[in-house]
Amino acid sequence: REISTIMGIEQYCLFRLGDAGFPAQQLQFSCNEIKFPNADNSKLLQEGEWYHVAVTFDTEKKVAVMYVDGREQSRIEDYGKGEPINLGMQNRGKDFMFKIGHSYGEPTDFSRQLDGEICEVRVWNVVRTQQEIFDNMYNVDPTTSGLCAYWKFNEGHDDIAEDYTGHGNDAHAHTSPAIWPEGIEVTQKNKE
């Protein structure tokens, strides 16, 4: 599989692993069809390991930064068009909605589905600092200013992933029944 999507909107703003001609185990951010970083085998994620991954995009300063386990991995300046990103836009059709673990096509099309597991996803409308990302890799107060959505994926029932911020951005699983993880132990790398 060439692309393994973490989250985003196809052809608009995606955080993913791999791409055509790009290493399958390297993180890539693609916004308005501008992709970063360049292919680099020194940045590959190892199969079978848990990672905390994050990307920040300051649209005003046109700077995007990618973090792995709370540490800066890649940075690009003069990135993007300087326009805000709207992950809530739904006027492009169902194939182009914000998705987690999948980016395009029908739920039964596994060609761009994440080949892995996700413990939590957070979406912010502020640029988090490296220190904030590192300190809050494993937990954050759901009422923190700028936190728009926070899915823990630990509900264990139905097909709804609750948004813990209280903003009502509940996510719906496209597999039925949803598979909820149990007993996952994730090493807290910021506490080692």
Predicted segments, located by residue:
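Extracellular glycan-associated modules
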Residues: 1-169, 175-192
